[in-house]
């Protein structure tokens, strides 16, 4: 009997990430990215059984053309792929309060995703396009589509964690509250940490740090999220690649009233021109800050050090505050995501801020835990910090299989 495979779709406003996984073994058969949708140079790249390929999709191509290319041009390279796909999993950025776990797509579920568009105006419409196109291209799997929400893991937060100190009517009538993001990643690494530490999943206490171009920290007590750094939108919290994270809200009034900036200009500044990009005035790429932190060239060292120091200081503040929130035994601090998994420097500076709590970095272990490697990075007999590569696709595949595939 052929393997039962899951097709995973992550539709952005101008891109589509895709992969095919065996949910039992975690083996990735195919992965790829279609990007630059609606532009003249829309394109697709993929890796099939380790072999890379790429192609132009055509002027103005988008989600439909990308999915059709996958089916008509990539699948024939290995006919077992299409035959093996028995379900489709979709990553959804925002599920509002309605969804606390992954669910099979129904008309009611689609309505719920539509209702949450107000909180994710770029992402949720694109996710709905992905669902619609999947129905069209794989009609025999219409009842085998599952949505996995980035916000679901954070729905266990208590009221004191998710409410803003705003008029309560804004929450009651409009749903203005903290929702968080990266929940699938925080869920995965918290479970993996429990396994590695020999702690039951419903007992594990960890602080998980998902650090990539976007970044967030979550406090996980007894296996459940009790707080997270992102809020109503993914703008709140840590310093990120181009996002400012926490700021005094009155800065926006100053930008509007005194500097004469429009609401659109302010939004663009906070979401696309701030963070590491704003601090370095060069790039949103954390590697610039890491590579030039000790550069003899002052023009490179100063912006790199400024950005890195602010980034790590703010990260350490969140970790320290979440130690207080967890309020009991802390099993580990877990680093994941592109920066969390690969930047030994970010981890070093951050943990140096936490020496009060007994954290002592092991330099050799820290340098070893990069580029796909994992492990504990602190000295023996000291509080544990560790690196665990995330695998959101595996969570999506496993949730999809759990709901759709009968052994």
Swiss-Prot record:
Substrate binds at residue 91. GO terms for molecular function: acetate kinase activity; ATP binding; magnesium ion binding. Catalyzes the formation of acetyl phosphate from acetate and ATP. Can also catalyze the reverse reaction. The active site is at residue 150. ATP binds at residues 17, 210-214, 285-287, 338-342. The keyword ATP-binding applies. Belongs to the acetokinase family. SUPFAM superfamilies: Actin-like ATPase domain (SSF53067). Pfam families: Acetate_kinase. Mg(2+). Can also accept Mn(2+). The keyword Nucleotide-binding applies. It is found in: Cytoplasm. Pathway: Metabolic intermediate biosynthesis; acetyl-CoA biosynthesis; acetyl-CoA from acetate: step 1/2. CDD domains: ASKHA_NBD_AcK_PK. The record marks 182, 243 as: Transition state stabilizer. It is an enzyme of class 2 (transferase). This is Acetate kinase. The gene is ackA. It catalyses: acetate + ATP = acetyl phosphate + ADP. GO terms for biological process: acetate metabolic process; acetyl-CoA biosynthetic process. Keywords: ATP-binding, Cytoplasm, Kinase, Magnesium, Metal-binding, Nucleotide-binding, Transferase. Its EC number is 2.7.2.1. Mg(2+) binds at residues 10, 392. Its main location: cytoplasm. Its cofactor is Mg(2+); Mn(2+). It comes from Mannheimia succiniciproducens (strain KCTC 0769BP / MBEL55E). Coiled coil: none annotated. It comes from the Bacteria.
